[in-house]
Amino acid sequence: MSQMPIELKGSSFTLSVVHLHDSQPEVIYQALQEKIEQAPAFLKNAPVVINVAALTAETDWIKLQQAISSTGLHVVGVSGCTDDALKKIIAQAGLPLLSEGKAQRRVVEPVAAVPAAVKTQIIDTPVRSGQQIYARNCDLIVTSNVSAGAEVIADGNIHIYGMMRGRALAGVSGDVQSQIFCTHLAAELVSIAGRYWLSDQVPEAYFGQPARINLNQLDNVLTIKPLD
């Protein structure tokens, strides 16, 4: 049998979500330009999802979309839209409306749980610019340096025993309890479960220092402290 011309498979990707808190195109354009200049390797020409939860139907979406696209970012979808009129405008612009699915409740009989071994992926070589390491369904340990322009990603925790100059994204499948441990922090970006800091948002006192980053469960923001 000849091979089918196409094949559909499920997959997952790490995308930045831009939350809009202003509807003025020129304000959004300037704010995005500043962010791109701070982390060009991460944001230049990047695909993004736009969250419009704070906007209303009075928003001139066409001009707003043009302002975002003119920065070089590629809008691949829109999330957080609850206004029916705004939904229609966005759909007419040819963009998909994204929403977080809610799992259906189901009743299962209790069974004796067998503790699963915690998996860990270990990288013993330097992670160079342009490389991406993804530890799916496990923690990631890097025993060497991570260069600027490199990306280390994990569904669990990330441990970096070297100079961290690239991007570290922990808990990418939504694990808000994931953490980042680093012996020499100089990252372009750190992220836990979608919440992230660019390099200029990391407290200066921790630059080049051993640090531990986690997500505060009370207010859902990143926090940092010395790595003892």
Swiss-Prot record:
<dbReference type="GO" id="GO:0000917">
    <property type="term" value="P:division septum assembly"/>
</dbReference>
<dbReference type="InterPro" id="IPR016098">
    <property type="entry name" value="CAP/MinC_C"/>
</dbReference>
<dbReference type="InterPro" id="IPR007874">
    <property type="entry name" value="MinC_N"/>
</dbReference>
<protein>
    <recommendedName>
        <fullName>Probable septum site-determining protein MinC</fullName>
    </recommendedName>
</protein>
<keyword id="KW-0717">Septation</keyword>
<keyword id="KW-0132">Cell division</keyword>
<dbReference type="InterPro" id="IPR036145">
    <property type="entry name" value="MinC_C_sf"/>
</dbReference>
<dbReference type="GO" id="GO:0051302">
    <property type="term" value="P:regulation of cell division"/>
</dbReference>
<dbReference type="InterPro" id="IPR013033">
    <property type="entry name" value="MinC"/>
</dbReference>
<comment type="function">
    <text>Cell division inhibitor that blocks the formation of polar Z ring septums. Rapidly oscillates between the poles of the cell to destabilize FtsZ filaments that have formed before they mature into polar Z rings. Prevents FtsZ polymerization.</text>
</comment>
<dbReference type="GO" id="GO:0000902">
    <property type="term" value="P:cell morphogenesis"/>
</dbReference>
<dbReference type="Pfam" id="PF03775">
    <property type="entry name" value="MinC_C"/>
</dbReference>
<keyword id="KW-0131">Cell cycle</keyword>
<dbReference type="InterPro" id="IPR005526">
    <property type="entry name" value="Septum_form_inhib_MinC_C"/>
</dbReference>
<comment type="subunit">
    <text>Interacts with MinD and FtsZ.</text>
</comment>
<dbReference type="GO" id="GO:1901891">
    <property type="term" value="P:regulation of cell septum assembly"/>
</dbReference>
<comment type="similarity">
    <text>Belongs to the MinC family.</text>
</comment>
<dbReference type="Pfam" id="PF05209">
    <property type="entry name" value="MinC_N"/>
</dbReference>
